Swiss-Prot record:
<dbReference type="Pfam" id="PF13740">
    <property type="entry name" value="ACT_6"/>
</dbReference>
<comment type="similarity">
    <text>Belongs to the UPF0237 family.</text>
</comment>
<feature type="domain" description="ACT">
    <location>
        <begin position="5"/>
        <end position="74"/>
    </location>
</feature>
<dbReference type="InterPro" id="IPR022986">
    <property type="entry name" value="UPF0237_ACT"/>
</dbReference>
<dbReference type="InterPro" id="IPR045865">
    <property type="entry name" value="ACT-like_dom_sf"/>
</dbReference>
<protein>
    <recommendedName>
        <fullName>UPF0237 protein PAE3582</fullName>
    </recommendedName>
</protein>
<dbReference type="GO" id="GO:0005829">
    <property type="term" value="C:cytosol"/>
</dbReference>
<dbReference type="InterPro" id="IPR002912">
    <property type="entry name" value="ACT_dom"/>
</dbReference>
<dbReference type="InterPro" id="IPR050990">
    <property type="entry name" value="UPF0237/GcvR_regulator"/>
</dbReference>
<dbReference type="GO" id="GO:0006351">
    <property type="term" value="P:DNA-templated transcription"/>
</dbReference>
């Protein structure tokens, strides 16, 4: 398994989870874990995804998710899980 973290933040609206998930599914990316919440109309979601069978590299996936985020009016960030592992060592 090769893991990445997808973070989404913005004003709550219909279709955010569907839009982000559709980009992931299109590229054969599996959602391993997901947490989402809405606080005072602010939507927040973090996904752990398996990119090992993806048909694009993480850079292309990031670009497409960011573009989908713009369409949805939310901010999307994508990081390889190793970034967080290295941060814990500092």
């Amino acid at each position: 398994m090769e893991l990445a973290v997808v973070s989404v933040l913005g004003a709550d609206r219909v279709g955010i989870v569907a839009g982000i998930s559709s980009v992931l599914a299109k590229h054969n990316v599996n959602i391993v874990d997901i947490s989402q919440t809405v606080v005072q109309n602010i939507f927040s979601m973090v996904m752990i995804v398996d990119i090992s069978k993806a048909d694009v590299d993480i850079s292309q996936l990031r670009r497409e998710l960011e573009e989908e985020g713009k369409r949805l009016g939310v901010m999307v960030a994508v990081y390889h899980i190793d970034v967080f592992k290295y941060m814990q060592r500092i």
